[in-house]
């Protein structure tokens, strides 16, 4: 079972505190696996591998966080998800990231956007021959006591100019895009949210030893 908490625009520090609360409850088995879905006011956050040259050059504040990955931006028009999920042993961090990617690739497909994984790069991408790869969703996670924190940010209709002040995710040869840019119309967070709920419910939770083994028909996704 995957539960959801739906919020509007929440300051980053407030959402981070809520993540920690839910994480402690999930570790103690007091709640089911739970995903926060929300937006943030404009903010830069830097993962543990962020280099100085990747930070904004104009002195814009950056919040250091305990997730993997590098620097990114969050803000209105971007649907942010924080899945708090207890993983089975042995812990498969890469598998967790891949399941998030698969869910978001499916969301993009639901809207008519062909998105893919790019080898060696986390997140969800749009690729075109002869053009730079364009990131449409960023992913950065942390696992503590077998339970995940942080998650993903899917660009619906944000102001992409914020990304020009940084080296997003430490990738100077890549660009950032959104569902609205790719489709040529305004794609809102409200439109995308139910699709994300459906696809996370379908893909996110890992198989556990007690789960029913699916038939070949139900496993063909």
From Swiss-Prot:
Signal peptide: none annotated. Transmembrane segments: none annotated. It is found in: Cytoplasm. Substrate binds at residues 67-74, 138-140, 151-153. GO terms for molecular function: lipoyl(octanoyl) transferase activity. Keywords: Acyltransferase, Cytoplasm, Transferase. The active site is at 169 (acyl-thioester intermediate). Residues 29-208 form the BPL/LPL catalytic domain. Disulfide bonds: none annotated. Its EC number is 2.3.1.181. Pathway: Protein modification; protein lipoylation via endogenous pathway; protein N(6)-(lipoyl)lysine from octanoyl-[acyl-carrier-protein]: step 1/2. Pfam families: LplA-B_cat. Coiled coil: none annotated. InterPro entries: aa-tRNA-synth_II/BPL/LPL, BPL_LPL_catalytic, Octanoyltransferase, Octanoyltransferase_CS. SUPFAM superfamilies: Class II aaRS and biotin synthetases. One of its GO terms (cellular component) is cytoplasm. One of its GO terms (biological process) is protein modification process. Gene3D superfamilies: Bira Bifunctional Protein, Domain 2 (3.30.930.10). In the reaction, the free carboxyl group of octanoic acid is attached via an amide linkage to the epsilon-amino group of a specific lysine residue of lipoyl domains of lipoate-dependent enzymes. Catalyzes the transfer of endogenously produced octanoic acid from octanoyl-acyl-carrier-protein onto the lipoyl domains of lipoate-dependent enzymes. Lipoyl-ACP can also act as a substrate although octanoyl-ACP is likely to be the physiological substrate. Belongs to the LipB family. This is Octanoyltransferase.
């Amino acid at each position: 079972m995957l539960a959801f908490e739906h919020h509007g625009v929440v300051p980053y520090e407030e959402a981070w505190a809520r993540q920690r609360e839910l994480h402690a409850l999930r570790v103690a088995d007091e709640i089911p696996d739970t995903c926060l879905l929300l937006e943030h006011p404009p903010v830069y956050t830097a993962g543990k591998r962020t280099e100085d040259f990747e930070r904004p050059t104009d002195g814009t504040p950056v919040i250091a966080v305990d997730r993997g990955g590098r620097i990114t931006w969050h803000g209105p028009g971007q649907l942010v998800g924080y899945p708090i999920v207890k993983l089975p042993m042995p812990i498969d961090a890469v598998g967790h990231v891949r399941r998030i990617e698969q869910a978001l690739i499916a969301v993009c497909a639901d809207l008519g956007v062909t998105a893919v994984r790019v080898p060696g790069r986390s997140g969800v991408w749009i690729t075109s021959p002869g053009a730079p790869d364009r990131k449409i969703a960023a992913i950065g996670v942390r696992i503590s006591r077998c339970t995940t924190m942080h998650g993903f940010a899917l660009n619906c209709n944000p102001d992409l100019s914020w990304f020009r002040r940084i080296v997003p995710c430490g990738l100077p040869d890549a660009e950032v895009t959104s569902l609205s840019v790719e489709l040529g119309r305004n794609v809102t967070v409200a439109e995308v949210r139910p699709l994300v709920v459906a696809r996370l419910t379908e893909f996110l939770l890992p198989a556990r030893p007690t789960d029913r083994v699916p038939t070949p028909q139900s496993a063909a996704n």
